[in-house]
């Protein structure tokens, strides 16, 4: 089991690395999901996520698609998009993923990994928004 601290990591790069780990059969736990960052212009990011959450079908709006508003679910959905979700292999890989806001008691004191290639300090222009800020904008709890 790998415990990854998402604090200061770029969401897309984190998601691609984690998706690869899941497909290789590893169990992955991500903590501090609300502190992961999405790079780009703040207004454009907020507009994109707002449009996603308001998507509905005209025939029956209860059918979806449904996009999350909580920060841990936003991270899970991003990783799901990088897995072959419609195959049995992709669904089994997705079940091996756990995402948490903050650090739960069961993982406190354990060694947390980070992904150096995905760290925000590698950006040339530090324009980003945290996943927690996006979730708060969408009306999520965390």
From Swiss-Prot:
One of its GO terms (cellular component) is cytosolic large ribosomal subunit. It comes from the Archaea. Disulfide bonds: none annotated. InterPro entries: Ribosomal_uL13, Ribosomal_uL13_bac-type, Ribosomal_uL13_CS, Ribosomal_uL13_euk/arc, Ribosomal_uL13_sf. Keywords: Ribonucleoprotein, Ribosomal protein. One of its GO terms (molecular function) is mRNA binding. SUPFAM superfamilies: Ribosomal protein L13. GO terms for biological process: negative regulation of translation; translation. This protein is one of the early assembly proteins of the 50S ribosomal subunit, although it is not seen to bind rRNA by itself. It is important during the early stages of 50S assembly. Part of the 50S ribosomal subunit. Belongs to the universal ribosomal protein uL13 family. This is Large ribosomal subunit protein uL13. It comes from Pyrococcus furiosus (strain ATCC 43587 / DSM 3638 / JCM 8422 / Vc1).
């Amino acid at each position: 089991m790998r415990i990854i601290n998402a604090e200061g990591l770029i969401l897309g790069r984190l998601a691609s690395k984690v998706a690869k780990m899941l497909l290789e059969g590893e169990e992955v736990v991500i903590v501090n999901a609300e502190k992961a960052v999405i790079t780009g212009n703040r207004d454009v990011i907020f507009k994109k996520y707002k449009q996603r959450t308001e998507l509905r079908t005209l025939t029956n709006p209860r059918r979806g698609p449904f996009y999350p508003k909580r920060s841990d679910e936003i991270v899970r959905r991003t990783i799901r998009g990088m897995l072959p979700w419609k195959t049995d292999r992709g669904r089994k890989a997705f079940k091996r993923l756990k995402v948490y806001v903050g650090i739960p008691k069961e993982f406190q004191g354990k060694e947390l990994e980070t992904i150096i290639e995905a760290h925000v300090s590698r950006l040339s222009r530090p324009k980003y928004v945290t996943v927690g800020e996006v979730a708060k904008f969408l009306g999520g709890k965390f």
